């Protein structure tokens, strides 16, 4: 599909010209009203207010300078982000600092990006201002409270260049396996990736349904930013937004919003589907119907097959179609979207021989009773944009052989901010002896392990997280899925080296149950036996140590991904407070 040199500001002006009175973004605030207070902006309002913010930013710096957005979830966040782009600045979307403690991640990102301004709101300006420090001799960033600007006064719109085809924003990675780095996302990347995802999710563009985007995802994360702000703009859709906290407090709100938004599309990580199943009652769904939900993307973290099944079964009585669930693979370095099953297909799984998988071969299980690992299909990706490559030789792997997923195309971003060496290593890979139809390069090395089997993409996990025990490869996501089917909570499977080899250690979050200390210990012993047996049976592995900890003990990133390297460090320093010390 062709990608033009259009920019996000040019699209925003086009929406304001062509659909001035159409609702663009609606934010539902459950904090001020448990039933939800809705506040909306039309496309003309979004455009005029973004221009006013851009005019204010012109006083702070020049196009190409960075502007950090540290605001609560809401319409002000949308306006701040689009205002930064309208001025030709490079936006840096971030979360507001954690209250009461120093937010090291916010400090590190601000030091790395060196913004000339910080866009925030009056409700959090006191916390945000503490981070507006000078770095490397540069002036401290100007703090602008977006909600205190006169955004409604009629005025002549300032003239801005609409041809900002370079960097649009820096998407700082969550850092599950390394220090966070700023991914440079261009205007072309955004438009190309949203367009690509629309083709992937709906097939024929002429058949793309009109409708509403529904999202509670944080606007500072790649999936939340693209889904909540960029996709509605590029695809001419209305957005219905709420805060992550509103979802976490009452997951049923997500399902209720999906049921009352007409034809709608949404997305969430795997854990959200699990929460919706467990914490949405029949009373919550009384009188509601999900037949108009055209798609719910499951992405951002490993998709558990059992969770998908539970979600479909739970909401089938409310007419949710199985074809609405869209397993998707992507990453910030490719803007967001890379692959998904074809439109109209229900989620498909294949059970692979586990012993063969540990040897790097994907062989579907037969009827011989071999132990299998069930993986979900991410569809048949375009061979010109996705290849499976041997990470050591840089030679493309044949079908059925596990390797690193490489990605090519207009959606691949510009690299890492101020990290030329890392950019060259990750973004400038070239295939050795490429097939006639394969581009030699540049290819993005995703760091993810996958395989093409029967033309479809299956994903195992991160290369850096791979567990090598007794000379065989084991995938921590698979082991964690086995544990979670028993315990229901978060689990981390890590490899801890001893004098000879690596040993499997499982860290499991578990809520203590029992009225007496004896009952608690009996339950913990039972869980340990059940988990140890399940891992041995499903993965042919011996657990060297199984650590039961309280919920919230496992280190995670801001997007909820397990920081396995931090788990290893904490375990080796005896930093986990074990529930099972007497077990």
Swiss-Prot record:
Gene3D superfamilies, per database record: 3.30.300.30, N-terminal domain of ligase-like
GO terms under biological process: Actinobacterium-type cell wall biogenesis; DIM/DIP cell wall layer assembly; fatty acid biosynthetic process; lipid biosynthetic process; phthiocerol biosynthetic process
GO terms, molecular function: acid-thiol ligase activity; adenylyltransferase activity; ATP binding; ligase activity
Keywords, sorted A to Z: ATP-binding, Fatty acid metabolism, Ligase, Lipid metabolism, Nucleotide-binding
InterPro entries documented for this protein: AMP-bd_C, AMP-bd_C_sf, AMP-dep_synth/lig_dom, ANL_N_sf, FAAL/FAAC
Matches recorded under Pfam families: AMP-binding, AMP-dom_DIP2-like
CDD domains from the UniProt entry: FAAL
Top EC class, one word: ligase
EC number of the protein: 6.2.1.59
Biotech applications: Vaccination with the fadD26 mutant protects against progressive tuberculosis more efficiently than does Bacille Calmette-Guerin (BCG). It suggests that inactivation of DIM synthesis can increase the immunogenicity of live vaccines, and increase their ability to protect against tuberculosis, indicating that fadD26 mutant could be a potential vaccine candidate. A double unmarked sigE fadD26 mutant is more attenuated and more protective than BCG and is also a promising new prime TB vaccine candidate.
Knockout mutant characteristics: Disruption of the gene abolishes the production of phthiocerol dimycocerosate (DIM) on the cell envelope. Mutant is attenuated in BALB/c mice. Mutant induces less pneumonia and larger delayed-type hypersensitivity (DTH) reactions. It also induces lower but progressive production of IFN-gamma, IL-4 and TNF-alpha.
Pathway, per record: Lipid metabolism; fatty acid biosynthesis
Swiss-Prot/TrEMBL catalytic activity: holo-[(phenol)carboxyphthiodiolenone synthase] + a long-chain fatty acid + ATP = a long-chain fatty acyl-[(phenol)carboxyphthiodiolenone synthase] + AMP + diphosphate; eicosanoate + holo-[(phenol)carboxyphthiodiolenone synthase] + ATP = icosanoyl-[(phenol)carboxyphthiodiolenone synthase] + AMP + diphosphate; holo-[(phenol)carboxyphthiodiolenone synthase] + docosanoate + ATP = docosanoyl-[(phenol)carboxyphthiodiolenone synthase] + AMP + diphosphate; dodecanoate + ATP + H(+) = dodecanoyl-AMP + diphosphate
Claim: Hydrolase is one of the keywords in the record: no
Keyword Ligase appears in the UniProt entry: yes
Domain of life: Bacteria
GO cellular component, one term: cytosol
Family to which this protein belongs: Belongs to the ATP-dependent AMP-binding enzyme family.
Protein name from the UniProt record: Long-chain-fatty-acid--AMP ligase FadD26
């Amino acid at each position: 599909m062709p990608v033009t040199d259009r920019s996000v500001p040019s699209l925003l002006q086009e929406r304001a010209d062509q659909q001035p009175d159409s609702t663009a973004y609606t934010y539902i605030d459950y904090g001020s009203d448990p039933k939800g207070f809705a506040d909306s902006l039309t496309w003309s309002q979004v455009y005029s207010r973004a221009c006013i913010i851009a005019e204010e930013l012109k006083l702070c710096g020049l196009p190409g300078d960075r502007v950090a957005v540290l605001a609560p979830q809401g319409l002000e966040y949308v306006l701040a982000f689009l205002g930064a782009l309208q001025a030709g600045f490079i936006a840096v979307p971030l979360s507001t600092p954690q209250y009461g403690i120093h937010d090291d991640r916010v400090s590190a990102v601000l030091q790395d990006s060196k913004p000339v301004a910080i866009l925030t709101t009056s409700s959090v300006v006191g916390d945000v201002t503490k981070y507006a420090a000078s770095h490397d001799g540069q002036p401290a960033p100007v703090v602008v409270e977006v909600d205190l600007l006169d955004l409604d006064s009629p005025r002549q719109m300032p003239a801005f260049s609409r041809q900002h085809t370079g960097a649009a924003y820096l998407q700082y990675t969550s850092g599950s396996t390394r220090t966070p780095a700023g991914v440079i996302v261009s205007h072309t990347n955004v438009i190309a990736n949203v367009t690509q995802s629309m083709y992937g999710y709906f097939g024929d563009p002429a058949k793309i349904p009109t409708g509403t985007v529904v999202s509670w995802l944080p606007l500072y994360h790649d999936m939340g930013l693209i889904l909540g702000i960029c996709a509605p703009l590029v695809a001419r859709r209305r957005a219905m937004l709420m805060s992550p906290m509103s979802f976490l407090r009452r997951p049923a709100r997500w399902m209720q919003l999906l049921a009352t938004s007409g034809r709608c599309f949404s997305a969430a990580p795997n854990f959200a589907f699990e929460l919706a199943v467990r914490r949405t009652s029949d009373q919550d769904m009384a009188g509601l119907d999900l037949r108009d939900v055209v798609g719910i993307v499951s992405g951002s973290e490993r998709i558990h097959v059992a969770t998908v099944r539970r979600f479909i079964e739970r909401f089938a009585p409310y007419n949710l179609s199985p074809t609405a669930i869209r397993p998707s693979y992507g990453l910030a370095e490719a803007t967001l979207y890379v692959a998904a099953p074809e439109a109209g297909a229900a989620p498909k799984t294949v059970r692979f021989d586990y012993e063969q998988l540990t040897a790097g071969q994907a062989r579907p299980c037969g009827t011989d009773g071999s132990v299998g690992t069930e993986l979900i299909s991410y569809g048949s990706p375009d061979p010109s944009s996705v290849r499976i490559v041997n990470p050591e030789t840089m030679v493309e792997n044949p079908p059925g052989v596990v390797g690193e997923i490489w990605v090519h195309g207009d959606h691949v971003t510009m690299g890492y901010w101020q990290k030329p060496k890392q950019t060259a290593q990750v973004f400038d890979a070239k295939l050795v002896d490429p097939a006639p139809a394969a581009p030699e390069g540049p290819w993005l090395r995703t760091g993810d392990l996958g395989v093409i089997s029967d033309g479809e993409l299956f994903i195992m996990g991160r290369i850096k997280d791979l567990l090598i025990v007794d000379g065989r490869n084991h995938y921590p996501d698979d082991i964690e899925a086995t544990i979670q089917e028993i315990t229901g909570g978060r689990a981390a499977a890590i490899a801890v080296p001893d004098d000879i080899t690596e040993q499997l250690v499982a860290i499991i979050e578990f809520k203590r149950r029992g009225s007496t200390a004896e009952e608690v210990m009996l339950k913990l012993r039972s869980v340990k036996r059940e988990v140890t047996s399940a891992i041995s049976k499903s993965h042919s592995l011996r657990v060297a140590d199984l650590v039961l900890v309280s919920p919230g003990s496992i280190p995670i990133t801001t997007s909820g991904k397990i920081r396995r390297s931090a788990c290893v460090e904490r375990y080796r320093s005896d930093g986990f407070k074990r529930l099972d010390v007497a077990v």
